[in-house]
């Protein structure tokens, strides 16, 4: 579930952004953006010149200088406004999160158990390791792990999802988040963070972006823009002696206007806004990124590790067939399978019970009346079952049952091996059922591949992204599902160590890897991956290891995360192309106007046939300011994104933003020149 999206130009945000734009006129704020700092200095210089001209202290056209000065200030203000609007949208999202963080008291237990004596303390004084009790109606005061109890928890304030979730001690559902509310029962929680370090605190700090650090690509682009600015600054400085030597020195106001129009002010004014907006779009998808670096890395990812269950398949495997071993009838197998599944509350376990009912009218037995001992599934044993009336029935993976049979002095039948292979080749998961040391047969669990997922993987392949399916299934089952889903590769019988080794292998090849995870056993791989999306429903260890948290706990979101990252990089690249292409058109407007009096041959460059030198220069400066405003929606929303190969994407962007960057200024400057002339302003 995504959060409610703010309108692009929300009136309250626009008003606040205008105020912030004025505040950002101070030198300290401007210094952070070297390109716009040059414009700020030019604005200050031309303001002083126009005042001197108006007072008679300097010769020249005071009105023209004042007009140039005014539009240079407007250019700075528009750049400030773009950044302030992006920050304002993020802060509005942060304010909604701050509403969750309430000052409250907590019941700090003196001993780590329910019923122990408790002290009432302010929630913001709780430290890592403190034990607290929360009951129905209470706000959970800190991030932590449930060490006792189980409760229904409303996490809508954090995730936006209205359905309550169960949090209980043990397993992967023991992690709780401060600011969420207990709906029923009680929990004893051990705080896992100190004040100011909670998940909610980190969300607010990230969203507000007050300490937002530039990403590597952003730093590289800033260095390029500074280099271009220095080149144009030196070029402009040398033009004054050339014009003076020709006998008609160009005014400082015109030189400043020329410099501002030539340096890449468009991308310089929008660069910060693009970065802030990228993180804001990620939050709009209900994904919290720890830094802009993580969002940027998502755009460079070329390997996706995707869990099979829930991402590639629907995740609710259903029993579809009972396949008895040689000498065993199907009803005997179904009866044993149903008994072994009576206490199994997983979707797979319930489907086995239902299939036995449907096929052989085997009604579900009363668990209490059986006087049986149920054996739960564990990651170590990889099987579950029941002990009843001297019968020991188990169901589980092929390898686990094989070890169990051999440990009990039995022999695993060759015909069952063949049946297991047959089930696996069909893309189903085989579960083997055994009674004592006698193998009864195989249950086929069919998992359904999601509709349209094959087409999405084909699009990712076009973009040069390799998809790898991660599954605990055996190789035959994994190969069948991988072929059906259209992934490029797969890792079968995956263990945490195997995932980690696979990530390191791809990284050694120079690739960037993205993955999702939710369990403590995923933490090492999440920490190693370049883009690691932890599920909000997962453990604290997983969330700390990842550099993003998906509030919806939807593994499929990884594809959307990559989409947003690539869109941010494309937006930055497209607007940089547009900005640099702009300079060519402005060159044709200003150079003839500024130097035609000294060098008449330059009139040949006046292909736009602008009204006069003054109108040409002023039109270029006005266009330079207005284009920033027109591009703000594109910077905030991102450019249109289509899954294409790198070369096709480059060609498309060069046509749209390169050619567009050349043509738009020619048209815009000419229109502004006509308006100035018609209105008699020049």
Swiss-Prot record:
This is Potassium-transporting ATPase ATP-binding subunit. It is an enzyme of class 7 (translocase). Mg(2+) binds at residues 518, 522. The chain crosses the membrane at residues 34-54, 62-82, 219-239, 254-274, 588-608, 616-636, 656-676. GO terms for cellular component: plasma membrane. It comes from the Bacteria. The keyword Transport applies. The lineage of its organism: Bacteria, Pseudomonadati, Pseudomonadota, Gammaproteobacteria, Enterobacterales. The gene is kdpB.
């Amino acid at each position: 579930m995504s959060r409610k999206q703010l309108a692009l130009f929300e009136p309250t945000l626009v008003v606040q952004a205008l105020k912030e734009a004025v505040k950002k006129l101070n030198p300290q704020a401007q210094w952070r953006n070297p390109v716009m700092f040059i414009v700020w200095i030019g604005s200050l210089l031309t303001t002083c010149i126009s005042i001197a001209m108006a007072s008679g202290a300097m010769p020249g056209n005071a009105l023209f200088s004042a007009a140039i000065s005014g539009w240079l200030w407007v250019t700075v203000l528009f750049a400030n406004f773009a950044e302030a609007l992006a920050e304002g949208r993020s802060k509005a999202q942060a304010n909604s999160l701050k509403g969750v963080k309430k000052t409250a008291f907590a019941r700090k237990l003196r001993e780590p158990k329910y019923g122990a004596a408790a002290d009432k303390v302010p929630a913001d004084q709780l430290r890592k390791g403190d034990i607290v009790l929360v009951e129905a109606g209470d706000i959970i005061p800190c991030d932590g792990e449930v060490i006792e109890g189980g409760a229904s928890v409303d996490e809508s304030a954090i995730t936006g999802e209205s359905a309550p979730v169960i949090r209980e001690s043990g397993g992967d559902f023991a992690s709780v988040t401060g600011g969420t509310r207990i709906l029923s029962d009680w929990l004893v929680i051990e705080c896992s963070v100190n004040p100011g370090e909670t998940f909610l605190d980190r969300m607010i700090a990230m969203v507000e972006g007050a300490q937002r650090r530039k990403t590597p690509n952003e730093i590289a682009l800033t260095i390029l823009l500074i280099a271009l600015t220095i080149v144009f600054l030196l070029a402009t400085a040398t033009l004054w002696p050339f014009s003076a030597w020709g006998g008609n020195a160009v005014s400082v106001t015109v030189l400043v206007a020329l410099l501002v129009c030539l340096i890449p002010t468009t991308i310089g004014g929008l660069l910060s806004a693009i970065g802030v907006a990228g993180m804001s779009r990620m939050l709009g998808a209900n994904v919290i990124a720890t830094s802009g670096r993580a969002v940027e890395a998502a755009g460079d990812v070329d390997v996706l590790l995707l869990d099979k269950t829930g991402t590639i398949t629907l995740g609710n495997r259903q029993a579809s067939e009972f396949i008895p071993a040689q000498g065993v009838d199907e009803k005997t197998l179904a009866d044993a399978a149903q008994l072994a599944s009576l206490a199994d509350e997983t979707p797979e376990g319930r489907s086995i019970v239902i299939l036995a009912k449907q096929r052989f009218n085997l009604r579900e037995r009363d668990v209490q009346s059986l006087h049986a001992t149920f054996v739960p599934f564990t990651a170590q044993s990889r099987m579950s079952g029941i002990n009843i009336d001297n019968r020991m029935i188990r169901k589980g993976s092929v390898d686990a049952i094989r070890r169990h049979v051999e440990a009990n002095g039995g022999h695993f039948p060759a015909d069952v091996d063949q049946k297991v292979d047959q089930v696996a080749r069909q893309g189903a998961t085989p579960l083997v059922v055994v009674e004592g040391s006698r193998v009864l047969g195989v249950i086929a669990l069919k998992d359904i591949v999601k509709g349209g997922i094959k087409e999405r993987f084909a699009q990712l392949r076009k973009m040069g992204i390799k998809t790898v399916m991660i599954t605990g299934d055996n190789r035959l089952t994994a190969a069948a599902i991988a072929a059906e889903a259209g992934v490029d590769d797969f890792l079968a019988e995956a263990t945490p160590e195997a995932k980690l080794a696979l990530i390191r292998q791809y990284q050694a090849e120079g690739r960037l890897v993205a993955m999702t995870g939710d369990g403590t056993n995923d933490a090492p791989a999440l920490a190693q991956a370049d883009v690691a999306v932890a599920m909000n429903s997962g453990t604290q260890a997983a969330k700390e290891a990842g550099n993003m948290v998906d509030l919806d706990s939807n593994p499929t979101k990884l594809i959307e995360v990559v989409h947003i990252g690539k869109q941010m990089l494309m937006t930055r690249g497209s607007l940089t192309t547009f900005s640099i292409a702009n300079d060519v058109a402005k060159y044709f407007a200003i150079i003839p106007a500024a130097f035609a009096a000294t060098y008449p041959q330059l009139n040949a460059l006046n292909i736009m046939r602008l009204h006069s030198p003054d109108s040409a220069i002023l039109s270029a400066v006005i266009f330079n300011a207005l284009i920033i405003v027109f591009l703000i929606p594109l910077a905030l929303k991102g450019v249109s994104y289509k899954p294409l190969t790198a070369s096709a994407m480059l060609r498309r962007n060069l046509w749209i933003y390169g050619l567009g960057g050349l043509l738009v200024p020619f048209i815009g400057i000419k229109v502004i020149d006509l308006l100035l002339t018609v209105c008699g302003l020049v």
